[in-house]
Amino acid sequence: FWSYKLKTEQLIGSNIKKVFNFYATPKNLNLITPPFLNFKILGNDYEETEEGRIFIYRLRLHNLPVFWKSKIEQWNPPLKFVDKQLFGPYLKWHHHHIFEDLGKETKVIDIVYYTVPFGSLFHKLFVKKDLINIFNYRKESLNNIFNS
């Protein structure tokens, strides 16, 4: 199995409390997820996130239906939270959301540790490109929401 790390950073023109609260509201994930994924949160319609909370999503990857179950493993508002995939397309997925207080701005750092099935060629041909596109869309969406 092949393990990888993806890291992105973004400066958002809003204070850390507002930015963290945006991330802590599950329905906002729909606003920063590309439409091509047909992303939908299933089950409980939580207003906010907390440690131990489990979320189930449905999406489409390359036109294939995918179910994803994740758990909030760490919750340290307004500085950090970590979600872990319990079931889904990856063999392993740990997503660290880190927020740095810069006064009137916030630096958002995403670090994802993940393991893919089917080896490095599958990662190179599909997964890496998909993740870059997804996180680029997220950056653009966050810019439109906070920096407009």
Predicted regions and their residues:
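Beta-strand elements of well-folded, non-transmembrane domains
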Residues: 12-14, 61-63, 74, 89, ...
